[in-house]
């Protein structure tokens, strides 16, 4: 807020370090307030702001300045003087990305050479992140807990983090509290990765019907050695029940909602630094069995995190004159062919249980609307009044060429994230769309990167994404019209139950 800081006239990180030793010696609140007031004064004269606007009364989110109201009169007056004459337009530390309006956190030193930052830099990490979220996160109001209480809660964790791993885990827990699947430790988490285990299982597992189920082999040739069948349910690892492990690990797996957290836990739950783990599992004969499961180094397996990458064609005709399209491999040049080849089909199934390889909301979405149809509007933050978020106008899908007359069924699940969710919103605007499946990842909106001391790299959803009526998609995800989830029985039989349901919907007169 302070114009001198906004101009880049102070290295704000180092100013904190210069101030902290004096601050920690304050004997009481009165001493403390005097120190803060004299610190603010030392930054230089603040000219009266002639173009500072008050918060828009229709703003979707308003700056949370309640903490100022709780200060002593003298300190309150000083801080409000800064706020009322705050920096406008260009800012050294934060801007808004052109065209989109998500925050661009500039000139924040990542201090990458310190793998384990000292106490001062760990505090800086906490303060930097807390403020970025407080003023520039569009979904602060959707958190389960009060963000204002988080500083005091995390101070001991950051101060007492005794090594690199504890510092990384403290950061992950803080990041997890904003409940945004885009927000995780995307870089610099080397010790966390080691802690999860360097050896991997030969099988892919997923949580299905609240149980940990074997769904695939990474390498077919290891099938016999693994001694597990597709559909086997793993109930214990090294003697510990799966639900207990999930409970312990949850705080280290940031996510917008529970299905997405389980998605991410399942990718790591069988990892270990040992060469084998002991598992208890139940096969389809309902017998409980125990075995040692051999683990492998990552590079010796054809490992995938969410789904096996396919190189195949993105569209095909199914029986009964039904078109099928997967966005996993869709190319720009496929779109005109899909429109011409599928125009007379009974229905089209679009599979977005993946991350789209091409951006299609408008190019393909226009095939399903008979007139220009609004499908989304955004909330954007404001560098001139940090903490204020206002709605943009709705964005419409134009109707172009011939409109498809059949039924459109869209498949989604917890693998549908970000652009996949945005694309689902576009298809939902269609004349005759049914979305089926289960809770999506609940993280939409262009991402903003955040660098923290120690070279930690994280991100946030930087704009709010809403339906035209204002309904939110963050955390709740894209709510399907018909909920369909895979079953253990279906996995054992090799069925795609969502696809089967989609076909049934299309064939129903």
What is the role of each PLM region?
Residues 1-106:
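Cationic-aromatic interfacial patches
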Residues 13-20, 32-43, 79, 126, ...:
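Short amphipathic alpha-helical coiled-coil/interface segments
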Residues 61-98, 114-132, 193-244, 332, ...:
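PDZ/PDZ-like domain segments forming the peptide/carboxylate-binding groove
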Residues 145-153, 245-252:
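Short, conserved phosphate-binding/catalytic loop or strand-edge motifs used
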Residues 482-509:
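Low-complexity, Gly/Ser/Thr/Pro-rich intrinsically disordered linker/tail segments
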Residues 1-11, 16, 20-27, 119, ...:
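Cleft-lining beta-strand/loop regions that shape enzyme active-site pockets
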Residues 432, 442, 447-488:
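C-terminal structured "cap/appendage" subdomains that terminate the fold
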Residues 129, 225-257, 349-351, 427, ...:
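Conserved PDZ fold ligand-binding element
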């Amino acid at each position: 807020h302070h114009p001198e800081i906004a101009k880049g006239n102070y290295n704000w990180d180092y100013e904190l370090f210069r101030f902290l030793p004096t601050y920690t010696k304050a004997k009481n609140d009165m001493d403390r307030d005097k120190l803060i007031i004299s610190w603010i004064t030392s930054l230089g004269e603040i000219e009266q702001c002639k173009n500072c606007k008050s918060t828009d009364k229709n703003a979707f989110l308003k700056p949370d300045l309640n903490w100022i109201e709780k200060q002593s009169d003298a300190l309150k007056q000083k801080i409000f003087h800064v706020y009322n004459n705050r920096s406008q337009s260009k800012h050294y530390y934060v801007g808004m990305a052109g065209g989109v309006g998500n925050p661009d956190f500039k000139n924040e030193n990542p201090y990458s050479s310190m793998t384990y930052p000292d106490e001062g830099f760990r505090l800086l990490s906490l303060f930097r992140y807390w403020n970025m979220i407080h003023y520039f996160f569009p979904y602060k109001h959707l958190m389960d807990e009060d963000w204002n209480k988080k500083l005091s809660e995390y101070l001991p964790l950051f101060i007492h983090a005794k090594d690199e791993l504890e510092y990384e885990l403290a950061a992950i827990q803080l990041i997890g509290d904003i409940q945004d699947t885009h927000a995780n430790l995307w870089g610099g988490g080397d010790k966390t990765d080691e802690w999860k285990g360097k050896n991997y299982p030969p099988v892919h597992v997923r949580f299905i019907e609240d149980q940990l189920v074997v769904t695939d082999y990474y390498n077919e040739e290891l099938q016999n050695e693994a001694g597990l069948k597709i559909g086997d349910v793993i109930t214990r690892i090294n003697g510990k029940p799966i639900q207990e492990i999930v409970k312990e690990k949850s705080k280290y797996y940031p996510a917008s909602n529970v299905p997405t957290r389980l998605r991410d836990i399942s990718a790591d739950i069988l990892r270990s630094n040992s060469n084998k783990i002991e598992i208890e599992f139940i096969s389809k004969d309902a017998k409980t069995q125990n075995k040692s499961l051999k683990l492998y180094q990552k590079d010796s397996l054809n490992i995938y995190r969410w789904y096996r990458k396919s190189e195949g064609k993105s569209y095909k005709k199914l029986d009964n004159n039904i078109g099928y399209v997967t966005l996993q491999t869709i190319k720009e040049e496929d779109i005109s062919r899909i429109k011409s080849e599928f125009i007379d089909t009974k229905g089209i199934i679009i599979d977005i249980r993946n991350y789209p390889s091409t951006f299609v909301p408008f190019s393909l979405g226009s095939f399903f609307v008979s007139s220009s149809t609004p499908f989304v509007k955004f909330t954007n933050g404001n560098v001139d009044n940090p903490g204020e978020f206002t709605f943009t106008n709705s964005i419409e899908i134009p109707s172009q060429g011939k409109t498809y007359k059949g039924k459109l069924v869209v498949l989604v699940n917890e693998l549908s994230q970000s652009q996949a969710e945005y694309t689902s919103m576009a298809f939902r605007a269609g004349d005759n769309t049914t979305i089926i499946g289960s809770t999506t990842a609940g993280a939409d909106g262009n991402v903003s990167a955040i660098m923290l001391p120690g070279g930690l790299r994280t991100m946030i959803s930087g704009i709010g994404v809403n339906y035209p009526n204002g309904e939110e998609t963050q955390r709740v995800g894209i709510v399907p019209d018909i909920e369909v989830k895979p079953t253990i029985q279906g996995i054992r039989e090799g069925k795609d139950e969502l696809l089967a349901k989609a076909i049934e919907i299309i064939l129903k007169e």
